[in-house]
Amino acid sequence: MNEIDVGTYIRHCNFFNTLENGIDQAHVPFTHAKSNFTKFGLNWDIPKITAEETDYGVAMYGTRANGVARVNHYLMPNILYIKGSPESAKEGWREAFAWRVPVDDVSHRSFNIALVHVSGDAALRFRERQRLQEETISKLPSAHVMAAAALAGHLSVHDIEERPDLVNIQDHVAQEGQGAIPNREAERLGRSDTAIILMRQIWRRELRALAEGKPLKKWSRPGRLVATSGV
């Protein structure tokens, strides 16, 4: 038996901000240095990033210092598939998917779903924890309000480390803080940006072909994909 965890949010920046953040494994030890990820090793070190184009999009590999690689998948044009970290040591790693959908040039919505590997008493505890988290969040200022306060310098994200939605707030700050439509001309990309560079090259190639009336790549979804935790 498994449980399903679903969620959605709006982020006030171009949807490419979130697309790129999602495939950037190196952002985790920085943006989420203080988060639930620490318990399960996702932010313990900075991985070496490699990526390759596939029939479905991009496969990303983040190899840790111990030689173990975390494998994520980006399915063109807007799907991310990863192993999501558990919220409890008694849960397995989740099969997590996110669809990023533009609303307009300066905002987008993410639709998220995860298969949670729990059964029996663990499933009951999962449902109760979800209920309590939703109840707690409903009584707090919204994630958008807290992110805006952090970006304005009125508080630090370290002041709100106990919030159940901390990771979402951290991502709001990191992505909206780049600007609704970032100035990419000012960037200095490095080795950890390998997956981002590849994704941009693919989008540039496909959009150029579309503009010139040339055939686009026929992306195909594989029968089976495997994401790994890397820890």
Where are these regions (language model features)?
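C-terminal catalytic domain of Rieske-type non-heme iron oxygenases
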Residues: 1-231
